[in-house]
Amino acid sequence: YIIIFKINIIHARSRAPAWSCYFASLITRRIFVTTFHGTYNFKSNFKKFYNSIMLRAKLTIAGSNFIFDHINENYSEYLSREKKLRVIYRGINIDYFNPKNISALKKEKLKQEWDIISNQFTILLPGRLTYWKGQEKFIESLNILIEDYNITNFQAIILGSDQGRKVYTKKLVNLVQRYSLIKKVKFISHCKEMPLAYS
């Protein structure tokens, strides 16, 4: 397909496909580019080698300064002058996420579905339920708002699927119960319209 469709640049955004893309780029002599998104687990040397595919490109894009520093601190042996590492921040479609494009009717309907109280601040944490997305820290922060600062005029929504990680979901629910935040925190597993959720 690379030759048939006259593709000049092969861009991989995750590790498993990056390996096949890397070898395809060698065979077809095309430019190989990767985007390094997260702090991949590298407890073993094999895992670190597996992750290193993201740095075998002519250009590796780090999605943030944090990831840039993480790469330099943990994968320096895979960096060289020939292979460039650059920070390019992820963009958003500002028209798609413009709150002016969301009707008042849709907003009201979502408030009813999620049982949002109008006279309280709403704090939204979107993202799949996983340790490195920070839901535990989020819940702990809510407890600090109440215990240390006596701020109670809020409600929090943790929006995202656990993708089968039931043990982690149970851990979060237990944390909410431990801090007596049951009336403050709602878990919503899915939302088709993220611009609506943000609005």
Name every feature range the model reports, one short phrase each.
Residues A57-V87, I92-P99:
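A short, active-site helix/loop in glycosyltransferases that binds the activated sugar's phosphate group
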Residues A12-A18:
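Short His-centered aromatic/hydrophobic patch
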